[in-house]
Every structure is written in C-alpha cells, then in structure tokens.
Amino acid sequence: MSTSKKVVVITGASQGIGAGLVKGFRERGYQVVATSRSIKPSSDPDILAVAGDIADPQTAERVIREAVAHFGRIDTLVNNAGIFVAKPFTEYSQEDYAQVVATNMSGFFHISQLAIVEMEKNASGHIVSVTTSLVDHAIDGVPSVLASLTKGGINAATKSLAIEYAKRGIRVNAVSPGIIKTPMHGEETHAALGSLHPVGHMGEIDDIVQAILYLDGANFVTGEILHVDGGQSAGH
C-alpha cells in the first residue's frame, strides 16, 4: 500500500473521455483506480482496474474499498460514467428511464458518498462530475429530457455538496461538455453535430480531460459548473 502519490478514482474509464482521463492523470503522476463494466486489467502497477456496474451500490463499495486497500487514500473522484438516450419525451420507456437514472444518478450518488467518507479522514479531497451543457441550453432536434433531468440534478448536487463540505477541505465541481468526439459518434455525424456549436466544430476528448485536470489543481475553485461546450451555453 502506497500513500506517496495522489490517487484518483475514475468511473466510466474504459473508453472515450474516461480512457482519456486515465491517461491524463497518469501523466500527472497519479495512481488511478479505473472502473467500468468492461474495464480490463492494466500492466501498469499504478492503475487498478475494478470491473462492475457503477449504478450498483455494491460496485461502488468495492471500488472504494479496493482503492484504499491498494493505494491507501482517495484524493479525487471523477464521476464520468453516464449514458445518453435521445428520444422524444413521450417515447421514453420505463426501461429507458430506469437505466438512465440508475447509471447517471445512482452511479454518482453511491460512490460519491463513500469517497467523501475517505476524503474526510484526510480533511482533503475533490469530486468532479461530467454533466452536459444540454442542461442549460436545450437544442431543437436533440431531445434530451432524461439527460437534463439526471445531469441537471448532478449540477445542483455539485453546488450543494460544495457548500456542505467547503469548511472540511473537500471541493466539488462539474464539467459540462458540449458534444465531444467519442466512439459513440460516427465520423459521418461530425459535421452536423459540430454545427450545433457556435465555434462550428465538436470538442475533443482532451478538451474535457484538460478542464478536469485544471479543476483538480485549482484549490480556490469549488461549486463551479465549468462549461466546455464551444459556446453552446452562451447562446446562438
């Protein structure tokens, strides 16, 4: 068990933004606990992979327990796991609702609770969640009620937790992306999706990684919802 390096827990870490975050934090010298349903073991001794469904409280408990057992502490939690189901409001099924709420909200709630318990032991820590600019700026033709419901709730919880734990050394922030080039968006969609942003193009995974790394080192910033969205939240 090592306590000499900072330790970050990253959910949804197997691909896209999550995989970028694993790389970015390792380059900063962090020990990384990476979790997702499909995560594979790493040959890097400073990366601990823990497979499981983050919506399940038992997975959250196992991730935190193994993080502390292997690395001795938790400095940062990145709540990156999330799913997006785009449908007209009246076409959402009960299964859609349950799945999105479970991953986006339960996947935030349980592991954040447990991480804060560990952070309080050191009177220091940082939680940063990935939400969406659609919460603040709905787009015609992109039906997103479930994303707005769940990620909007996390934005609100971010501010509430930031105030609750401000005097206990724990900061809580969120990054609110626009549409990012990830494996979920085929290359044939990039031009159309890029046109939804005032800057005229989609964001890159590294845009989100760098925003999260900035927040992790910005000790005077808490309760912030940082929009990384090519101007979407500012208007059209």
Residue ranges and their predicted role:
Residues 5-6, 73-74, 119-132, 142, ...:
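Active-site loop of short-chain dehydrogenase/reductase
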Residues 14-15:
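Conserved glycine-rich cofactor-binding loop
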Residues 51-62, 94, 207:
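The beta1-alpha1 cofactor-binding region of Rossmann-like NAD(H)/NADP(H)-dependent oxidoreductases
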Residues 88-89, 96-101, 193:
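Substrate-binding pocket helix/loop in short-chain dehydrogenase/reductase
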Residues 112, 150, 158:
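Active-site helix of classical SDR
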Residues 117, 159, 163-167:
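Alpha-helical segment proximal to the catalytic Tyr-Lys
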Residues 170, 204-228, 233:
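C-terminal substrate-recognition "lid" of short-chain dehydrogenase/reductases
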